[in-house]
Swiss-Prot record:
Disulfide bridge map: none
Pfam families assigned: Mu-transpos_C_2
Source organism: Pseudomonas fluorescens
The HTH IS408-type domain, residue ranges: 11-93
Annotated DNA-binding residue span(s): 23-44
Keywords annotated in UniProt: DNA recombination, DNA-binding, Transposable element, Transposition
Function, in words: Required for the transposition of the insertion element.
Keyword DNA-binding included in the entry's annotation: yes
Segments for region (Disordered): 486-558
Family: Belongs to the transposase IS21/IS408/IS1162 family.
GO molecular function terms noted in the UniProt entry: DNA binding
InterPro entries in alphabetical order: HTH_IS408/IS1162_type, Integrase_cat-core, IstA-like_C, RNaseH-like_sf, RNaseH_sf
Record's protein name: Putative transposase for insertion sequence IS1162
GO BP of this protein: DNA integration; DNA recombination; transposition
Amino acid sequence: MAAQRVAMRNIKECLRLKFEGGLSHEKIARALQLSKGVVSKYVTAAAETGMEWPALAVLDEVALAAALLPTARVRQTRGERVLPDLITIHRELRRKGVTLQLLWEEYVAAHPEQPTYRYTQFVEHYRRYASTLKRSMRQQHRAGEKLFIDYAGPTLPVIDPATGEISRAHIFVAALGASNYTYACATPGETQVDWLTALGQAFSYFGGVSEMVVPDNPRALIAHPDRYEPGLNRAALECARHYDTVMLPARPRKPQDKAKAEVAVQVVERWIMRVRHQQFFSLHALNQAIAKLLEDLNQRPFKKLDGCRREWFERLDQPVLRPLPQHPYEVVTFKRCKVNIDYHIEVNGGFYSVPSALARQSVDVRLSAHTVEVLHGNRRVASHLRLQRRGAYSTQSEHMPASHKAHREWTPQRLLDWGERIGPQTRQIVEHQLTHKPHPEMGYRACLGLLSLARQYGNARLEAAASRAVQLRALNGRTVRNLLKQGLDQQPLPKPATPAAQPSSHENVRGADYYTQEELFDDDPTHPEPIAPTAAGRHGPSTGRTMDAAGQPQPELR
């Protein structure tokens, strides 16, 4: 079967869709009606030229065909040719903008009097050298371009000195693509806060920011998993925006996308796990031990390359890293809230005001350790300091409608004075409302609702209803309002219950004062003789009988 013939304009369009559009081979093939094999063939041919896409894009069809489709390969003689410095070439290719074409030209210029290899043989020698390295080392990462991050599998124990409880610390690993310069730290877990906090610490350790960050596909950072374009959650996007970088998660189950991170994790597991037999009583102590091991790791010489991680970092990545922002990223969380009718939202037990026009609408809340920001339509509409007490209110006057601003000007004394002008019973209810509501704002509203009844019913009726409410011991505005609605304030107050009838005066009836006399409790034998009762009881002595000193009746003489 004859090979598929492709017009040069389609080849050029194929390369544009690949290098500018970033489309997959399958999508390009479908768009241009080509096979995936043909697309791969020309993309590979373009890569083999050593030229970047902008250089290929300016070529006409004839020049592009000459670059991509050489009609014959010139055989090279096996004379004494100068062998290029392959280790230096491998290192230099990590610099941004450096290509094999440029390095070949420099190689030829450096040996003007000696026979050198043609470009194709130059590339062939380098590829043979690169094939002796590990696969992950063959990937070309530009200096300062990518930072790979991941978590190591094993965890380390941390003992609580107070309770003896053991928690497991997770090891975060970050490695720069060009130099393999590595950072690691221990975190309490692998939550969103842990990922983003550790990433900020890694940037601080490197002293700069890479162009891209390549994480795995952690749930803590991914909102919408996808094989080709996984969607980051809002916190991860904000973190990337703060550091002026791009976060590009690797594809699920595609370890080759983050081979640098996989290798770094393996190195860290073998190097830092030397502390696994030590006991640590805080995360800080564990991170101090990890920091010491990191210095040794980054200064250890490479096995197949010259130098060490630190030397390569100082030579390649460090000069081209982007500057750090003035302040590190403060990790935030987002939640969706609905504004209550009183133009407040509830966040973790606290109540925060928003513009009153947003009542009953949904807003986004950006919650940090110290602030609460409210967003509507991606625009910040309110900002509050975070409340530390549950049930507390944070209300800003500019969020209140005009009528509520007037209400806010009321003070407890002003409300009490208004109630006093209506009547003492009304003032008593106002005072009760101010002191028995859980929040002062609630007390103000209740008092204003009570006092506003005077406009509808008049001061006299309000005071009468307040008097009846006080008598009923129902000191609240609802009771007063119901009394006014039913007209009960215009009925006379019920008379207080009359006390029970007192017994008639009698010489044997003693009052309360009698039992407080000290003489009743005096054991002095000079106590006066008791007076015989004038009336005989059922079993008592008869009338006219005298009593002896002991109080006993004397025998009657007949």
